[in-house]
Design a protein with these regions (language model features):
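Terminal amphipathic alpha-helical/low-complexity segments used for targeting or macromolecular assembly
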Residues: 1-128
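Structural signal for interior beta-strand "rungs" in well-ordered beta-sheet cores
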Residues: 126-129, 133-211
Length: 211
């Protein structure tokens, strides 16, 4: 479906999304803020050096709790709102593009802290919540598995640092959507790029910085 006033819709939604992102970040901060305030209530009557160290440590821990909460919230929301689109080519100026862009908003929020959490089980949980199918023993050392709901990783896959996995691209006025499938034991080198529609065989190696 083409949208005749696509730019207007795009600008209005962008204006609305910015405060929405602030709300998500704020809600995610609640556990960390609570922990910090509880620590401050205890530390305020302590000797100065203990109050100083305790405040610094509690601030640091609160930031970590905020980041983990933000990433997991983003994964949950991204999974709930991800578009169930069939592989294909869609007009860029269409409602499909708006659906896709909306789902990517949550990944952009997660990237505020996700780079700190990869590779780790928290990062893997995030990608699974966002819709990725991830086999056992995978190591994901990148915050750039875009369109997670269209990514399939077999057992033992290794994604190198800052590798980019895209299940979408834009060309000739169209949004192209196609799943990415990576077979068991494959290695995707650091800073490499895998484009939509790629199927990488079992045990294959994609060199660093390859496209």
């Amino acid at each position: 479906m083409h949208l005749k006033s696509f730019e207007v819709v795009q600008n209005v939604l962008t204006f609305l999304i910015i405060p929405f992102l602030g709300i998500i970040v704020g809600i995610a901060s609640i556990p960390g803020v609570w922990m910090f305030l509880e620590a401050r209530a205890y530390l305020v009557d302590q000797v100065y050096w203990l109050e100083l160290f305790g405040t610094g440590i509690s601030l640091g821990l609160a930031c970590v709790v905020w980041g983990i909460t933000l990433v997991l919230m983003s994964g949950l929301l991204g999974g709930l709102f991800r578009p169930r689109l069939e592989p294909g080519r869609y007009p860029l100026r269409s409602f499909v593009t708006i659906q896709w862009a909306w789902s990517m908003v949550f990944h952009r929020v997660a990237i505020l802290f996700l780079p700190v959490l990869v590779p780790s089980f928290v990062g893997t949980i995030y990608y699974r919540m966002a819709g990725a199918k991830i086999g056992a023993g995978c190591q994901i050392n990148s915050p750039h598995l875009n369109d997670a709901g269209s990514v399939v990783l077999g057992d033992g896959v290794v994604i190198g640092g800052n590798a980019i996995i895209n299940a979408h691209l834009v060309e000739k006025g169209e949004l192209v959507m196609a799943p990415v499938k990576i077979g068991k034991g494959a290695l995707i080198g650091g800073n490499s790029t895998v484009q939509p529609g790629c199927t990488i065989g079992e045990g294959a190696v994609v060199a660093n910085r390859a496209v």
